[in-house]
């Protein structure tokens, strides 16, 4: 699963997934 922050840099809601 690729980093959600890289697939959707506009979405900061899932940025704390790492």
UniProtKB/Swiss-Prot annotation:
The modification Phosphoserine is found at residue 13. It is found in: Nucleus; Chromosome. The modification N6-acetyllysine is found at residues 6, 11, 14. Keywords: Acetylation, Antibiotic, Antimicrobial, Chromosome, DNA-binding, Fungicide, Nucleosome core, Nucleus, Phosphoprotein. One of its GO terms (cellular component) is nucleosome. Phosphorylated during apoptosis; which facilitates apoptotic chromatin condensation. It comes from the Eukaryota. One of its GO terms (biological process) is killing of cells of another organism. One of its GO terms (molecular function) is DNA binding. Disulfide bonds: none annotated. Its main location: nucleus. The keyword DNA-binding applies. The keyword DNA-binding applies. The nucleosome is a histone octamer containing two molecules each of H2A, H2B, H3 and H4 assembled in one H3-H4 heterotetramer and two H2A-H2B heterodimers. The octamer wraps approximately 147 bp of DNA. Belongs to the histone H2B family. Core component of nucleosome. Nucleosomes wrap and compact DNA into chromatin, limiting DNA accessibility to the cellular machineries which require DNA as a template. Histones thereby play a central role in transcription regulation, DNA repair, DNA replication and chromosomal stability. DNA accessibility is regulated via a complex set of post-translational modifications of histones, also called histone code, and nucleosome remodeling. Has antimicrobial activity. Possesses strong activity against saprolegnia, the most common fungal infection in fish. This is Histone H2B 3.
């Amino acid at each position: 699963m690729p980093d959600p922050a890289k697939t959707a840099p506009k979405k900061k809601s899932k940025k704390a997934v790492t």
